[in-house]
Amino acid sequence: GINSRDLTYKSDTDKKYFAFAQQGSLWLYETGTKKLTQVFSFLQNGKLDARDIYDENNIRIINIDSSGNMTFLLCGYMNRCKHEGECGVAVYTYDAATTSITERLYVETQEAFSLLDKDVENLGYMSADRTHFYLTLEGSFYDINITDNSVTEQFSNLSSGCYVGSSTGGKFAWLQENKKYDSSTLNLRDLETGNDTAFTCDSDERLQPIGFIDSDLVYGVAKVSDIDTEDKGSEVFPMYKVLIVNSAGETLKTYEPDGCYVIGGSVNDKLLTLDRVKKTKRGYTETSQDHIVNSSADDEAAYGFAYVESDKKQTETILKTGETIEEGTTPQILYAKQVKAEGEEAAEVSIPAKKQTEELYYVYA
């Protein structure tokens, strides 16, 4: 269909099931049977009102297994259902065998959607046994016990740029000193095991996290003598090398650019984009970006979203599933029903707004 390019999908390891969200609805496609299931949507069949088109919410897929079972969450304003009118994070599981979804947890917050969505993008992860949900919110890292509705604030007052999370890989990393430009220990926690791994540097160096590629942590190392913090808001942390590591402490890849430095980066699926600068007599100047592709990215070429341009349909989005679908073939469409977990109600907790401990500015336009 015709959509924006800001789309993501997830699949199981066997590439049998593909889940994707578009226009406020979550869909699951099963190859082979060619069944397309609407897993979740606020939209009503046959009629629309303001609640259908209000888009201050977002669907995020956490994981999907080889049977098509899925964990996903909805963050932001709740257009309908029992939480209608509230703002928060609802965590659901989908059972492919019964074509049904179950709400496991609802977290009520006071944070605006634009900020909440960024927090959940950083980390919103449910443990494999469905007993714990981990969330970053307003500079704090929370462990929510779904079995007894308890909330534990593991870390608080985390500064911007001092922590990163992986919702798909179940990992969380934070600078021990909590100083973006002056930290020498970076801790990595496996949320399934609770084990921590510490990464350190030499005394004349400092560390900074960049992000995650799946469950692998990406961070950079800079020399203290190169770091420029004189102009507030224009600080430069020039990393002379970038490392990709796993939770066992093993270095999977080391990137050391020649004649330039890395000052930041972003991860889009399996592609790591690095922003770079060169050092001149007048300071640091921008230079070309560089990219690191995950080793499995080549295997992904037959899957994912592709874009076709035409005068009639403009930019059309196509989901590649690795199978050939004859033109004119229409998938069987199913609609999931919502059920309660047997003998239990969904856990509900509320996290109050926190007083900001650092000045933050958000650019809206």
Model regions: which residues?
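Surface-exposed loop/turn elements that mediate protein-protein interactions on large endomembrane-trafficking
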Residues: 1-3, 25-54, 82-115, 136-156, ...
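Beta-strand-rich domains and repeat architectures in extracellular enzymes and scaffolds
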Residues: 2-24
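Repeated scaffold domains used in trafficking and secretory/extracellular systems
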Residues: 2-10, 46-65, 109-125, 157-168, ...
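Short, hydrophobic/proline-enriched secondary-structure or compact coil segments at domain edges
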Residues: 16-20, 70-74, 270-276
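Hydrophobic beta-strand positions that form the internal "hydrophobic ladder"
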Residues: 18, 70-72, 132-133, 172-173, ...
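Residue-level signature of beta-propeller blades and closely related beta-rich strand-turn architectures
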Residues: 24, 76-78, 139, 178, ...
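N-terminal non-globular leader segments, chiefly Sec-dependent signal peptides
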Residues: 59-80, 86-93
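Loop/turn-rich, solvent-exposed surfaces of beta-rich toroidal or solenoidal domains
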Residues: 164-167, 171-175, 180-181, 207-232, ...
